[in-house]
């Protein structure tokens, strides 16, 4: 047996059906779409249409709503600020603002900023912070360290 004598088993490789290639092909003229009507035209996909039965979107109940006045917060942890201080990206003499946090890469957009104190039980640096919101524990830790919230 040689490489040029190899061939596929019968039925292993099936040619795809070529539609709209003449009447003799069996799928010519109307190309299997029937005669006239909406589904015989091009661009037929009707989103959500289930052939007359009530669509899924109407069978399921409405749930909840999106409040348009919800405030979106960037969450930042005291631990991250402490790490930025030890790395030298922030200094204790300056007021820490949202713009400064964007500049050093701790947050990446202009949404409101909320300071949390997850997994932080002590904070030693006296900082001046001007952010949009603070958790009660974060407030307590900063004021205990001699910092101030503007």
Curated annotation (Swiss-Prot):
The keyword ATP-binding does not apply. The keyword Protein biosynthesis does not apply. One of its GO terms (molecular function) is structural constituent of ribosome. It comes from the Bacteria. Pfam families: Ribosomal_L27A (PF00828). InterPro entries: Ribosomal_uL15, Ribosomal_uL15/eL18, Ribosomal_uL15/eL18_sf, Ribosomal_uL15_bac-type. One of its GO terms (cellular component) is large ribosomal subunit. Keywords: Ribonucleoprotein, Ribosomal protein, RNA-binding, rRNA-binding. One of its GO terms (biological process) is translation. Part of the 50S ribosomal subunit. Binds to the 23S rRNA. Belongs to the universal ribosomal protein uL15 family. NCBIfam families: rplO_bact. This is Large ribosomal subunit protein uL15. It comes from Rickettsia typhi (strain ATCC VR-144 / Wilmington). The lineage of its organism: Bacteria, Pseudomonadati, Pseudomonadota, Alphaproteobacteria, Rickettsiales. The gene is rplO.
